[in-house]
Amino acid sequence: MEFVGIDIGNYKTVIASSKENGKVYGDEQGKRSIRTVMELSTPVRRFGNGVTNDVEQSLDLRSRSFRDALEDKKGWGNLAMFMKYIDRVVKKNTPTHPPICMAVPAYFKERERRILVDIANTMDFKLEGLITDISAIAMFACVRRENMPSEFLLFDFGFSKTTAGLFSFEKNVLKPLYMKTVRVGSMQFDEKLIDIIVEKHSLEKSRLVREKIKRNLDKIKTTLNSTKCCNIQLFITENPLEVIITQEEYRNAVKSYLSDLDSFVSSVIKETEFNGLVEVVGGNSISFLIKEMLRDKVEYQVTLDVSDSTAIGAALGMACMSLRTRYSLHDIVGREISIRIQGEDVSPTVIFKSTELVEGNPKIVTYNRKESFVLEILEDGEVISTLNVVKGETKETKAIHVSFSIGKFGTVCVNSVECEESVDYEYKPFRISDIDLDDIKALEMKYRDGELGLERIGTMRNELETMAVGLGDALYNKFGKITNDEELNTVREVAMDLFDMPQSETVGQEEEVRNTILSKLEFISKKLSDYRDAAVEDLKKHKDMINEFRKEYGSVFTPSFYKLQGLLYKVDEYLKDFDLNLFNVKLFDESFIMEIKGDIQKYLEKAKLEIEEKRKEEERKSKKENAQEGTSSKPESKEESEAKEDNDEESDVASIDE
């Protein structure tokens, strides 16, 4: 069984399969990493690596960072469209429609997780689980590396954040012990690098200029990672721009962010009390600035893939959680979940600590109440949902047992509310309203219907042009007997007219173009139809010849008779699908008809000869048998009769024994 892991980061998205111990799926261009960007251009949207044209008009249609832009409806719609694009990439790579596990940041809480699940369900995105990204990386490490220590620390220096995770790995069971995140990554470094270039060369402080510089940042950073000075030519304006940046300039520009990361790493080491070899991953980990910062703080190694680890780990993690495998993964809640009765001035009761397991044992809380009440569910001290427990008022208090659990998506679930008397309850977690979900679905359909229509228009025009271009030569080579030069010239003129017609904007317009071209070629269609009718009639006559032969000689079986049976089947199969029109005339092969007609004639004659030969053989055999019977019934001579009598007399005496 296959599982797919998806890491939708703020910079890039990676799709991986659990096949082959972790295999990355490429996009329509075959690239392993898909840029997390979308452009709502018309008539066709652009996604990922297809977003290439940096012009002012397209920038206003461009969106990024879908994962972390879930605070409003616009962000929901953008994420939904990008998820649907990712779903199409998955389906292009595998026909099995496998379950999907998505990696999410450690700071994703109840609201973000539920938004993600609601959008996935609306988009028919087969999301079956969420896993914290640092846990996915740890899973990847355990599966790919031998002799993993029983406890290890990971640092993921990513694009928009930096995450640390401490894990235990005993008896092939992986469990997170500690997680921490700071919202600082290479994104902030990149913005400062762009600022240096803009200010140093007095460039226009526009979004377009920043986008053009952004496309060259990888080259600049790669150079700075190996040399103290980068000298590069950028094409930002009409004239090429010579850009010179030093490591020192870059270091000073990101000084405050480096300080934040330095403090973050120090706090993680102090809080975990870890003193072993640290594993470092993430795209920002290759920066000379990060290497300098880590050099005097920890002993570390970089042995995992800096880009694909999260997606592969998510796929492998879901496989390990769903199947009986050698490895087992337990993710943790990552935040504190508590409850309290609404309106009561009491401290909340903690039911799930941050280090408790997702899909772990449920927690049952008992309340002794006489009447209905409302429970507030809190996440790190903030109310995220309510549970309205409705019971009839009684004189005596009754025990009401409420069962809570953390589901596969890391969200709080109410399993049951039980009481010895009748009780009802309504759980009200955060969810996107049905109206908003319908709007999200309608937004995707609006764009997708137009794109599919455009694809259909392109397919229709391509089919029409292919037919028109090749029709003249096909008629000349295969149907020269039923067409003349004037007709062939007309066909070629129609093809030229087609290429002068503008591209249609709607399917209806393209259908009008198609009907116009076909009407001009109606005289050819009539000739082809007449030819087909004549060929069908001719083949049916040959069928009748075989059937008449079978009626006359049905009881006589010869090799050629069996061959005729096979030819009859061939003709029937050919006639089932035999069609001749403008679009398949190039594929028509008259030789089959000529060969099968010739074979029928040949084997009819051979069958007649074989039957005649069989008849003569039977006559010869009959004469021979008659001759043998005549010899055995011939009258005995007088001498033979007397001799026989003498023998009979002798035999009467010879049979006596002593």
From Swiss-Prot:
InterPro entries: ATPase_NBD, Hsp_70_fam. Its main location: cytoplasm. It holds the Pfam family HSP70. Gene3D superfamilies: 3.30.420.40, Actin, Chain A, domain 4. GO terms for biological process: endoplasmic reticulum unfolded protein response. GO terms for cellular component: endoplasmic reticulum chaperone complex. Residues 614-658 are annotated as: Disordered. Residues 614-627 have a biased composition (Basic and acidic residues). It is found in: Cytoplasm. SUPFAM superfamilies: Actin-like ATPase domain. It comes from the Eukaryota. Residues 642-658 have a biased composition (Acidic residues). Keywords: ATP-binding, Calmodulin-binding, Chaperone, Cytoplasm, Nucleotide-binding, Stress response. GO terms for molecular function: ATP binding; ATP-dependent protein folding chaperone; calmodulin binding. Required for normal growth at various temperatures. Belongs to the heat shock protein 70 family. This is Heat shock protein homolog SSE1. It comes from Encephalitozoon cuniculi (strain GB-M1). The lineage of its organism: Eukaryota, Fungi, Fungi incertae sedis, Microsporidia, Unikaryonidae.
